[in-house]
């Protein structure tokens, strides 16, 4: 499953859990680092696509930018916890990095975990 997982985990965690009980599942989270922090660009007008409402956001505020980063970190932690609880493996790909190397690293690490798990089962 490939997603940015920005929606509330309540909307996708249960279907992911059901999928993971029947299949080997890898949740691939695509992250744009520009969404993890808020740049100081002055007064920013944002529009809610659902309601059409607009809001002015004073991005010069250090306090606001710090709260934004904190909320983004909390959202990422909640996403990781929900994916783990659903029984899926979690691969994070960032748009500012070489995603191919991240995939290779993930496959090597995953293969080692599976091998270790199987070796542990054989020792019983």
Feature-to-residue mapping (PLM):
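Acidic beta-strand-to-loop metal/phosphate-binding motif
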Residues: 1-4
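Von Willebrand factor type A / integrin I
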Residues: 7-124
């Amino acid at each position: 499953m490939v997603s940015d997982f920005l929606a509330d985990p309540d909307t996708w965690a249960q279907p992911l859990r059901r999928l993971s009980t029947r299949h080997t599942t890898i949740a691939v989270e695509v992250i744009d680092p520009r969404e993890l922090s808020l740049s100081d660009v002055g007064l920013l007008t944002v529009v809610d696509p659902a309601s059409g409402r607009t809001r002015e956001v004073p991005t010069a505020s250090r306090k606001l930018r710090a709260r934004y980063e904190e909320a983004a970190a909390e959202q990422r932690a909640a996403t990781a916890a929900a994916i783990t609880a659903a029984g899926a493996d979690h691969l994070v790909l960032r748009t500012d990095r070489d995603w191919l190397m991240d995939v290779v690293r993930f496959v090597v690490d995953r293969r080692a975990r599976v091998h270790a798990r199987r070796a542990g089962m054989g020792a019983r």
